Amino acid sequence: MVLIKLNIIVAFMLALSGVLIYRSHLMSTLLCLEGMMLSLFIFMAAMITHFHMFSISMMPLILLVFSACEAGVGLALLVSISNTYGNDQVQNLNLLQC
């Protein structure tokens, strides 16, 4: 179980470092955020089954629902930005302008 936890934590940290490294492109950031959410889902599911905490067994599914909503909103924002500006680079956006 220790190796499984270590692998999941390493996957989360790699996705987090991907968010920090590839923050100039919105698509790469969204993919890394999705990797973080999936590693959190696997970690929560493994901990619930390991510690027999079946009273909170719906928490990983709730996390997946919020992850899907986040992905949908992110992709809609990506399509809107790429149609408006022609690319997905974050530094070209002026977010303070209406």
UniProtKB/Swiss-Prot annotation:
Main location: mitochondrion
GO biological process, one term: ATP synthesis coupled electron transport
Cellular location(s): Mitochondrion membrane
Entry membrane topology: Multi-pass membrane protein
Catalysed conversion reaction: a ubiquinone + NADH + 5 H(+)(in) = a ubiquinol + NAD(+) + 4 H(+)(out)
Listed transmembrane segments: 1-21, 36-56, 61-81
UniProt entry tagged with the keyword Transport: yes
Record bears the keyword Mitochondrion: yes
Keywords, ordered alphabetically: Electron transport, Membrane, Mitochondrion, NAD, Respiratory chain, Translocase, Transmembrane, Transmembrane helix, Transport, Ubiquinone
InterPro entries reported for this sequence: NADH_UbQ_OxRdtase_chain4L/K, NUOK/Mnh_C1-like
An example Gene Ontology CC term for this record: mitochondrial membrane
EC number, as in UniProt: 7.1.1.2
Pfam family, one: Oxidored_q2
GO MF assignments: NADH dehydrogenase (ubiquinone) activity
Function as written in the Swiss-Prot or TrEMBL entry: Core subunit of the mitochondrial membrane respiratory chain NADH dehydrogenase (Complex I) which catalyzes electron transfer from NADH through the respiratory chain, using ubiquinone as an electron acceptor. Part of the enzyme membrane arm which is embedded in the lipid bilayer and involved in proton translocation.
Family, per entry: Belongs to the complex I subunit 4L family.
Protein name listed in UniProt: NADH-ubiquinone oxidoreductase chain 4L
Lineage, uppermost ranks: Eukaryota, Metazoa, Chordata, Craniata, Vertebrata
